[in-house]
C-alpha cells in the first residue's frame, strides 16, 4: 500500500518534516517514492511553514495513496492557502 506521510528531519528539538509518498512497509525516514513538499512546525518570522505541491498530492490520491491524518489536514490547509 502506498501512503503519503511525513519523514522527520532536522535536529533534536528542532523538527522538520518532508512530506513524501512511500510504501507503507518502508521505515519512517527511509526509502520513499517522491517528495511532495515540507512542513516546518517551528517556523518563525519570514520562514515558510508549509510548502506542498497540491497537484502532485491530488494525483497520488487519485492513484489510491492513503494520506496520514496529519498530512490530510496539511493538504486541506495548502488548498485553502492557494
UniProtKB/Swiss-Prot annotation:
The keyword Ribonucleoprotein applies. It comes from the Bacteria. GO terms for cellular component: cytoplasm; small ribosomal subunit. GO terms for biological process: translation. Keywords: Ribonucleoprotein, Ribosomal protein. InterPro entries: Ribosomal_bS16 (IPR000307), Ribosomal_bS16_dom_sf (IPR023803). One of its GO terms (molecular function) is structural constituent of ribosome. The keyword Electron transport does not apply. Belongs to the bacterial ribosomal protein bS16 family. NCBIfam families: S16 (TIGR00002). This is Small ribosomal subunit protein bS16. It comes from Francisella tularensis subsp. holarctica (strain LVS). The lineage of its organism: Bacteria, Pseudomonadati, Pseudomonadota, Gammaproteobacteria, Thiotrichales.
Amino acid at each position: 500500500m502506498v501512503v503519503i506521510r511525513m519523514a522527520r528531519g532536522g535536529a533534536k528539538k528542532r523538527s522538520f518534516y518532508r512530506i513524501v509518498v512511500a510504501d507503507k512497509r518502508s521505515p519512517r525516514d527511509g526509502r520513499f517514492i517522491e517528495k511532495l513538499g515540507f512542513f516546518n512546525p517551528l517556523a518563525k518570522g519570514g520562514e515558510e511553514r508549509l510548502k506542498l505541491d497540491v497537484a502532485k498530492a491530488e494525483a497520488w490520491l487519485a492513484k489510491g495513496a492513503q494520506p496520514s491524518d496529519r498530512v490530510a489536514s496539511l493538504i486541506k490547509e495548502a488548498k485553502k492557502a492557494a
